[in-house]
Amino acid sequence: MSYQVLARKWRPQTFADVVGQEHVLTALANGLSLGRIHHAYLFSGTRGVGKTSIARLLAKGLNCETGITATPCGVCDNCREIEQGRFVDLIEIDAASRTKVEDTRDLLDNVQYAPARGRFKVYLIDEVHMLSRHSFNALLKTLEEPPAHVKFLLATTDPQKLPVTILSRCLQFHLKALDVEQIRHQLEHILNEEHIAHEPRALQLLSRAADGSLRDALSLTDQAIASGDGQVSTQAVSAMLGTLDDDQALSLVEAVVDANGERVMSLINEAAARGIEWEALLVEMLSLLHRIAMVQLSPAALGSDMAAIEQRMRELARTVPPGDLQLYYQTLLIGRKELPWAPDRRMGVEMTLLRALAFHPRMPLPEPETPRQSFAPVAPTAVMTPPQLQQPSAPAPQTSPAPLPASTSQVLAARNQLQRAQGVTKTKKSEPAAASRARPVNNSALERLASVSERVQARPAPSALETAPVKKEAYRWKATTPVVQTKEVVATPKALKKALEHEKTPELAAKLAAEAIERDPWAAQVSQLSLPKLVEQVALNAWKEQNGNAVCLHLRSTQRHLNSSGAQQKLAQALSDLTGTTVELTIVEDDNPAVRTPLEWRQAIYEEKLAQARESIIADNNIQTLRRFFDAELDEESIRPI
């Protein structure tokens, strides 16, 4: 007796046997029951979700000897022949192998003949999107008005490739990909009926690897049965799929949570020795993190497939804060997205896990715990005294002056500690900058520390450190949020961007125009004229010379293209209306820089404001403090008046 694979043996024989796709089955069953049967159906969806199976069930319901029904008998000759694939009036066509227009025409030549055995002649065209354009054109007329005894059932995995004229002539049903639980439940039912031993975790792995396709899941199950010597075991499925078992993936998660870098690298070496698929490793860890998060939300969310590691999963759900869990999940998720760009897949996984360790939320600060009790040992390492800089080779400690007072050292260490906790510590730029900060004479930083120490001597030094909890070290970026908000109040980002791009904001342009009106009578007169924008540019780029009713405008030669007879007439009319007398206007080209035009007045005022802005920035106490203590460099070219 020949063996029949599970995917063929367990093909649905009734609508009730179909897994999922209730939205499609309900519509088809109601149509068959009511007798409202369309002449063309299109089933679309990914591979292995039941497109061809549902089409055959529909053909069985149309040609059952008991009548058109949603529940065919399955015992009549027509039903049995359809199940066996030898029903003469069910013509199945593989469009991928018959793409030529001649094949389509041969098919349509037989449409006119009545069915030989059944009630309807059913044409089942699989992968219909593979037909050529000419084949679609040949099919259009028949598909729109077929004979009463003909039904078309089309199936495709890519409906976007079908012409809209074909889509408009069909009832389209899109079949959804099955979820993991639906596939797992069906596999469990089939294996129980086949009396094959199986493990819940193995079915979970097979269901996830099927990626929504029940046919793929059954094919993988056949392979797993062969690999497991007649049973479906987790070990055999993991080896077949190239995935880690739960214990190894969970051990990696535990090592990351415990910030145990050596354990992480050891587990990665073990995974490499097994020839693991690296992306599958990240997927498995992400799946475990998801299950832990679900257990935190609902303790009953842990299914029976996790029985072997249930205790460890619940312990992680109890001890790991939800915020930390989300951080690990996001880190691994981003690492998986960046994996194709890594020089090597293993390298990408290692860097992802190292990133998770680097951003460990509960990582202690790099400094030892001893400064919390006493800051005295910190003084020699926190501040480099001047003699150490001048005599680096002197071994005798007597040559160095006395260290800073204990209170000053405590304040310095506390300040450094608080800066690290708040995320404001900046990397020093260069060694010369470090040397300039350690000048032995007139060091205002030391003077400031001395003044601060007088104010904090009465306060216990350890209290300064207690204000910075170590647990929040990983969330340094939050400290920058108020700074951004305060900047937005001063000027909008759009205005600042325009200013830095050498563009004047509308507010600044209005100020410059107002001041130009105060300084230049001709600019004031232009502001009172009612002119089109193009004509106004003529007036703004010229200076006026008047003798009685004769007005001469001296236009810059670079703007000669603005001068036209129409512009002169409109400008003369506007001047006449403003003065109440007839003005005789002439325009000549003149590049004399001694007299400014209104636009040149605005530019001159802008230069004055720019010079004032530079002086104000340079003289600002805060800027001077930054330059003195942090060796900041002022980019004067970026200064713009706002």
Curated annotation (Swiss-Prot):
Keywords: ATP-binding, DNA replication, DNA-directed DNA polymerase, Metal-binding, Nucleotide-binding, Nucleotidyltransferase, Transferase, Zinc. The keyword Nucleotidyltransferase applies. GO terms for molecular function: ATP binding; ATP hydrolysis activity; DNA binding; DNA-directed DNA polymerase activity; metal ion binding. One of its GO terms (biological process) is viral translational frameshifting. Residues 385-441 are annotated as: Disordered. Signal peptide: none annotated. Zn(2+) binds at residues 64, 73, 76, 79. One of its GO terms (cellular component) is DNA polymerase III complex. Residues 394-404 have a biased composition (Pro residues). Belongs to the DnaX/STICHEL family. NCBIfam families: dnaX_nterm, PRK05563.1, PRK07994.1. This is DNA polymerase III subunit tau. It comes from Salmonella typhimurium (strain LT2 / SGSC1412 / ATCC 700720). The lineage of its organism: Bacteria, Pseudomonadati, Pseudomonadota, Gammaproteobacteria, Enterobacterales. The gene is dnaX.
